[in-house]
UniProtKB/Swiss-Prot annotation:
Name by which UniProt lists this protein: Antiholin-like protein LrgA
Major location category of this protein: membrane
One Pfam family cited in the UniProt record for this chain: LrgA
Annotated transmembrane regions: 13-32, 42-64, 71-93, 97-119
Intracellular or extracellular location(s): Cell membrane
Length: 147
């Protein structure tokens, strides 16, 4: 009987339960968005919130995995409204096409540069912390050898 309960605990949650978990995260992120002093989309807040919940173990991967996979597989359908908005805004785009293309190119280059710098900083911090651990271990071994 105990073995059966353990197997049930490791079984992924039902699809409807997973939808409820994701909906609750989005609901909470919508509430957080209303209290934030800076404008930030609730979907971004929800992603960060879900990431934190998964990392802390408050939400298990099995509780959101199937719905997450389904949404990821059908992500093209989720971009249809954005595509329709672009088509509806063609009048605005046609007024300054070179300016918009230039802005896209400049913002992409800036994004790549910022990403590169952040990656370098993270790599330096990570290598320093690993180096500090090795240095401490060597110093401890030397101290023990002198005793």
């Amino acid at each position: 009987m105990v073995v059966k309960q353990q197997k049930d605990a490791s079984k992924p949650a039902h699809f409807f339960h997973q939808v409820i978990v994701i909906a609750l995260v989005l609901f909470v992120s919508k509430i957080i968005e209303s209290f934030m002093p800076i404008p930030m989309p609730a979907s971004v807040i929800g992603l960060v919130l879900l990431f934190v919940l998964l990392c802390t173990g408050a939400v298990k991967l099995g509780e959101v995995e199937k719905v997450g996979t389904t949404l990821t597989n059908n992500i093209g359908l989720l971009f249809v409204p954005a595509g329709i908005s672009v088509v509806n805004s063609l009048g605005v785009i046609s007024q300054a096409p070179f300016l918009i293309i230039g802005l896209i190119i400049v913002s992409t280059i800036l994004l790549l540069i910022c990403t590169g710098y952040v990656t370098q900083i993270i790599m330096k911090v990570t290598s320093r912390s690993k180096g500090d651990k090795v240095t401490k271990k060597i110093k401890i071994e030397e101290a023990q050898a002198h005793d």
